[in-house]
Regions:
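N-terminal pre-ligand scaffold of iron-sulfur
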Residues: 1-64, 97-111
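Short Fe-S-cluster ligation motifs
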Residues: 77-111
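Short linker/helix segments within small regulatory modules
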Residues: 61-67, 86-90
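Intrinsically disordered, low-complexity segments enriched in small/polar residues
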Residues: 12, 74-76
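Short cysteine clusters
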Residues: 51, 71-74
């Protein structure tokens, strides 16, 4: 990943102002794009709003005990580390880096 090609977009001033659902997933706006923000073991990660398989809304899914994102539509599982489908179907979930800084929470979008 070449950090020169990342454009950082502020999505919140503080983590506490992010409206996480009971499933530890929130929807935020990063440069006009709906992005899911997940929270697992104290870390934040960003991933696509829709599942690449059939367009299920991932904000309505959940994060399992080992940190995979689960689509509510067909239960496809995606790694929060690399976006790979761990269910074996070969799909890839777009994901972006997240940084907690003194001046806010930022999602890095690749150009």
């Amino acid at each position: 990943m070449d950090s020169k090609n990342i454009h950082w977009h502020k999505v919140a001033d503080y983590e506490e102002e992010i409206n996480f659902s009971d499933n530890n997933i929130a929807v935020v706006n990063a440069n006009g794009k709906q992005v899911c923000l997940g929270k697992y073991n104290g870390s934040l990660f960003a991933f696509a709003y829709k599942c690449p398989h059939a367009g299920g809304i991932l904000a309505e899914g959940w994060i399992d005990a080992i940190g995979n994102i689960i689509c509510p539509q067909h239960r496809y599982k995606y790694s929060i580390i690399n976006g790979r489908n761990v269910s074996g179907e070969g799909y890839y979930l777009t994901h972006w880096p997240v940084e907690k800084r003194d001046d806010g929470i930022f999602v890095g979008v690749f150009s």
